[in-house]
Design a protein with these regions (language model features):
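Exported/periplasmic ABC-transporter solute-binding proteins
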Residues: 1-19, 25-27, 32-42, 49-52, ...
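Central helical "cap/lid" subdomain
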Residues: 62-68
Length: 231
C-alpha cells in the first residue's frame, strides 16, 4: 500500500504504522505539491494532508473515494534564544522589525497557508508582518531540509532567520534543542490546522479505519497532535 503524506506526519509515522498489520510505503512532502502529483496521475492508495482542502479537491474531481479528518494541529513560534527578551510574547516577537521571520510556502504547503491566516487574524499589525515574512521551506524551489533535521531548527541554526512559524506538534522536540525557545500563540489568533485523508483506492480502507481507531488516535496525540474536530 502506498501513502503520500504531509511532511509534518513524518515524525509520528513509524510509531503510527507499527501496530498496523499490512506493509505501508510512505513518501512525505508538502501536501499541496503531493496533491498536484496525484492530480497529474501519480498512483497512491491514500493521501494524508495537513488540511481539508486538498483531499476535498481530489474528492470533487473524482480522484478520491472518501475524505475523513483524523487529527489537528496548531502553530507556534520558534526563536533563537538570544533574541528573546524578558516579557516577550508571540506578538512582540513577530512585530519587532529587526527580526527576520521565516515560514513555509503558501499554496505548496498548508503550514504556509496557516501562517498567512495568522497574519490576517492579527489585523493591521499582521499586514506588516506578512510583508516581512519569507517563505524559506516547503516550496517547489526551496532548499531541501537536510535529512533528520526539523525545518525550524535548520532555518534558525543556519542563520537564515531569527523567528520561524511552524507546527506546534514539533514544539516538545524543539524545546529540547540548544539555543531555541518555543513560544505559544493563543486563540483566537492561532488557526486550527485540520488534517484529513483522501481514500484513493478501496485497498486503503483498512488503513483509513485504523487511523480513526482509539489506538492510532492515542499515538497521534502522544506525538503532539490534537484530536480532529468532528464535522
Amino acid at each position: 500500500m502506498k501513502v503520500l503524506a504531509a511532511g509534518s506526519l513524518r515524525t509520528v509515522w513509524t510509531s503510527l504504522m507499527a501496530p498496523f498489520p499490512e506493509p505501508v510505503e510512505a513518501e512525505f512532502g508538502p501536501a499541496g505539491l503531493l496533491r498536484e502529483r496525484i492530480e497529474a496521475g501519480e498512483f497512491c492508495d491514500l493521501f494524508a494532508s495537513a488540511n481539508l482542502a486538498h483531499p476535498r479537491a481530489l474528492l470533487a474531481a473524482g480522484r478520491a473515494l472518501a475524505v475523513f479528518p483524523f487529527a489537528s494541529n496548531q502553530l507556534c513560534l520558534t526563536v533563537r534564544r538570544e533574541v528573546w527578551r524578558k516579557g516577550d510574547d508571540w506578538f512582540s516577537l513577530l512585530t519587532r522589525e529587526t527580526l527576520r521571520i521565516a515560514t513555509s510556502t503558501p499554496g505548496a504547503d498548508p503550514s504556509g497557508d496557516y501562517a498567512q491566516e495568522l497574519f490576517t487574524r492579527m489585523g493591521a499589525a499582521g499586514e506588516s508582518v506578512r510583508r516581512r515574512a519569507q517563505a524559506l521551506v516547503g516550496g517547489r524551489d526551496s532548499a531541501p531540509i537536510p535529512p533528520g533535521r526539523l525545518a525550524a531548527e535548520w532555518i534558525l541554526h543556519s542563520g537564515k532567520a531569527e523567528v520561524f512559524i511552524g507546527y506546534a506538534s514539533y514544539g516538545e522536540t524543539l524545546r529540547q534543542m540548544e539555543g531555541l525557545k518555543v513560544i505559544t500563540i493563543p486563540p483566537p489568533y492561532n488557526p486550527l490546522a485540520n488534517y484529513a485523508c483522501a481514500v484513493i483506492t478501496p485497498q486503503a480502507q483498512p488503513l483509513a479505519d485504523f487511523l480513526l481507531s482509539v489506538e492510532a488516535q492515542k499515538i497521534v496525540q502522544q506525538a503532539g497532535f490534537l484530536p480532529s474536530p468532528r464535522e
